[in-house]
Amino acid sequence: MHAPLTAEQRDVYDKYKFATYARSVALTRAQLDQWRDNKVIVPEPVSRAETLRVEAATRGQSKNALWNLLRLDRSTASRSSGGVALRSSALAFGNAQENRLKLANGELFERLGRLAAERAGCPVAETVLDCGMFISAFGLHSASPDAYFAMADGSCVPVEIKCPFNYRDTTVDQMRLELGKANRKYRVKHTALLVNKAGPAQFEVVKTHDHYRQMQRQMYVMRNAPVCFYVVRFKHNLVALAVPRDDDFCRKEAAAEGAAFVAFATENAGRVQFKRGDRRRASFAQNAADHGYNAAQVDALVRRGLYLSYGQLRCGHCDAFALDGPRAFELAMARPHEQCDGLALQEHEFDNVAFLDFTKRYTSLVDKRCDDARALRVDGFYVDDAGAVKTFCCGVHGSNASRRHLPTCSYYLAMGVNKIQNNM
């Protein structure tokens, strides 16, 4: 059982849950041009400060509920490596041994810290043994090394620890004795290590192994990490190697993740148009072959916030609604969308729902020659049959000088949060 999320963890989850984050991705025209020309996006979508905030909130990894939640649907350094999931017994052994190794080998981490300072060209500011999850600059990928060194220049150097179940009772010398005799060097099974057969043991890291790719993805996600330390535990032995950053590998990772980020942003920009009632209505006309709704039913669906896309009814305000277009009208109208911010779902609370329609409000104001009709319509005002200017939502009378709503008015609250500019 995991402890309940704290207020800070809940805030991180609400922002970086993969589906929510992907839906929030957006680009300005200048950023999109930057990507097309140079394959970079400035400023970075996720700042370093935010990355460290997420890391701090997810420490404990598998024992932390937030860490488990943020991994769902997100590409991680270990999952991207293509390896087969470990058996539960081997995984439990590895996790337990990693924790013991970190606690019992202070001298090892002191030596690795000195090497990290040499590679980074600056001193270690902090050694973090209980590491959480790092989010990439684009926010779509993540990595959870076993430990890391926070450097004085703001960079981080990861440490990846492997405790193979198969070598729990095998020393390095015993492992080498079991190797063949035909070759000078042999791959060490279940690791990314290559070792010589004869003479003092000399280890290398194989670049084609999943562990190597995992470490490179960690260095990519952690941005300017110049090196990763690969530590493999045998019985009575530890093998520790420095794995330099592969710039070509990291560039390819950035290109792939950046392309996915731009695709999300483009899709989101296309969806924004359906917050407008006229665009939702047009979707039914443009896809007439995909539905059998009459004009009155289309009007009702549009007012409910629905549009038609690729044969599916979707909500212009949330992701929770998806229904095949030809389904019965009554089913579409009754289908709930939980946590949807579409105002049509609160229409039973409005003073005059007929003027939920943006254009209707504007027409009523223009017909009565009201000054500043465009601004008044955005603020929810219309002119009633008696010639009074009032809000369609909470029924408050107003004017150019006074545009007040009731404090609990759902339209007023949505307008403040979402800066409504188009037809609901």
UniProtKB/Swiss-Prot annotation:
Annotated localization: Host nucleus
Any one GO MF annotation of this record: exonuclease activity
Keywords recorded for this protein, A-Z: Endonuclease, Exonuclease, Host nucleus, Hydrolase, Late protein, Nuclease
Extent of the signal sequence: none
Enzyme class name: hydrolase
Main location: host cell
Pfam short name (any one): Viral_alk_exo
Domain of life the protein comes from: Viruses
UniProt-listed Enzyme Commission number(s): 3.1.-.-
Subunit structure: Interacts with LEF-3.
Protein name listed in UniProt: Alkaline nuclease
Gene: ALK-EXO
